Amino acid sequence: MANDQNKDYDKIIVLDYGSQYNQLITRRIREFGIYSELKPHTITAAEVKKIAPKGIIFSGGPNSVYDEGALGVDEDIFKLGIPILGVCYGMQLMAQRLGGDVEPADNREYGKADIEVTDASAKLFHDLPKDQTVWMSHGDLVTRVPDGFRTTATSVNCPISAMDDDDRKFYGIQFHAEVQNTQYGHEILHHFAFDVCHAEANWSMDDFITKQIAKIRAEVGDKRVLLGLSGGVDSSVVGVLLHKAIGTQLTSIFVDHGLLRKGEAEQVMDSLKGKFGLNIIKVNAKDRFLNDLRGVTDPEKKRKIIGRDFIEVFNEEAAKLNGIEFLAQGTLYTDVVESGTDTAQTIKSHHNVGGLPEDLKFKLIEPLNKLFKDEVRELGEKLGMPHSLVWRQPFPGPGLGIRVIGEVTEDKLEIVRDSDYILREEIAKHGLDKDIWQYFTVLPGIRSVGVMGDGRTYDYTIGIRAITSIDGMTADFARIDWDVLQEISSRIVNEVKHVNRVVYDITSKPPATIEWE
């Protein structure tokens, strides 16, 4: 959504200082019904004034305010009379620029910490317990608050864990209120948004649909749009939204690249072409993708190859059509942040944003690139899509190509397909499909000795990844009952050829990402 489409909404903007959590802050604010968007830290006071936000949040970041070339702020922003909340690095930056002191911590803090609220009148902590558990992630700390500020919370390793200047409506927290690990993070952000900023909850998905359709129609005019369908939730929702906006001007290409889940190609054609009437061209490009991936083991190279091949297929198919000017993609907000911004450290490139060539022949339309996964599901249901389609398991653009660790071969793909199908069957059979946010199998490329029947085997290991999450930015491993896991393991080793061992991934995000590659 462009800014001019959001003038009717109260909004709180988040300045980007490079934290991988910064998109989470915008998500939390949107959960209150307040529109929020990330802005570069280089934004000027004049630009902020034009946006007219109800509040500003300085995000965290990986650097020190004393680093050479440290990320700063237009100090005139402090003079606008707009409430500001500094989070982690954002608090340190606020303290330094307003005359306080910031120094390296004797002990870096990463993880849970206990704080004590020292001033019961502090607005951020109104009606909250004195003792709280929060999530810290910092190497520096504020050692002296600026004039006009007071300390409002403290901890053993961080004596100034929170501060405020109520008169100027400046607030700082050294911890991350946006992550689920902070006990009262939701309430703290709620206090800032409503009690400090006095923002009104007037942003909704219904409004998003109305304005996004108007935007698409204005941008596309009478031209034609090409959409790449992957079979996942994101591209399917884009297809239905575009079809609602421009009807027959949309042509969808479904590339069967040989990296899909079992039965997925048939399901895509039946659901979107049969039930929604989308014009879909199916392209069998399996041999092309597998040939280009032969011998490639580096995950970044695999992603780039898959992204490149997608675009090349689109170019070739578009050349057969007349009047195609736009390419639509199902890029999400999380795709953008994990691929890195000017200030964020790149974790991994995403298929939707990392594989595009400089000579792209189309103008891009990415109607979901400001939405999180749970918002996309809400959008799909608002558009009348069936629950079963909207709540399908998330599936990465590169497909099973990044669930086979190392070189991708047809034999390895079959192992992942068959094991993943068993996992999905068992999860559904035990009624866990609504509780587990995402679950899939992965082939790590590890072979080990086993015994099957009376003989020795030397076969592959299958990894199971099952996580709980709200928006994909942070995640925890799902606590699946041991008996269910045993049943899944037994079926996989008995029904999937060349597998003699099953392991369960019990790593959270962070430090791991959801996908293995």
Swiss-Prot record:
The gene is guaA. Its EC number is 6.3.5.2. Pfam families: GATase (PF00117), GMP_synt_C (PF00958), NAD_synthase (PF02540). The keyword ATP-binding applies. The active site is at C88 (nucleophile), H176, E178. This is GMP synthase [glutamine-hydrolyzing]. Disulfide bonds: none annotated. Homodimer.
